[in-house]
Amino acid sequence: MAIRPVYRPTIVKKRTKKFIRHQSDRYSKLKRNWRKPKGIDNRVRRRFKGQYLMPNIGYGSNKKTRHMLPTGFRKVLVHNVKELEVLMMQNRKFCAEIAHGGSSKKRKSIVERAQQLSIRVTYASARLRSQENE
């Protein structure tokens, strides 16, 4: 049976569109990633009507749902089986995410131990070889 979170609130984002960099649509050398405009005459910095919006604190998510996955869990990065034991009592609030640097052998042991402790693992099947391929 799948582990369910204690409660699963509706996650409301105040803004889902990305904030894009001023004039990134005009010049290909300017990437779309947000950079704060610093120019003395810049229209975006001066918040003129019809210009791109700048990110600010008002766009922040609700404190209760911040960093929450759509499943209702929060992620905790796990490097080995010992770090997984910390989540044993909190398995209805947090789920484990296996760190990128772990080998497939270590990943396999973490997934097995998580199943014993009934801890959910995000993307548990990644980099696990099936029996046919071995």
From Swiss-Prot:
One of its GO terms (cellular component) is cytosolic large ribosomal subunit. Pfam families: Ribosomal_L32e (PF01655). InterPro entries: Ribosomal_eL32, Ribosomal_eL32_CS, Ribosomal_eL32_sf. Keywords: Ribonucleoprotein, Ribosomal protein. The keyword Ribonucleoprotein applies. GO terms for molecular function: structural constituent of ribosome. GO terms for biological process: translation. The keyword Ribosomal protein applies. Belongs to the eukaryotic ribosomal protein eL32 family. PANTHER family: 60S RIBOSOMAL PROTEIN L32 AND DNA-DIRECTED RNA POLYMERASE II, SUBUNIT N, RIBOSOMAL PROTEIN L32. This is Large ribosomal subunit protein eL32. The lineage of its organism: Eukaryota, Metazoa, Ecdysozoa, Arthropoda, Hexapoda.
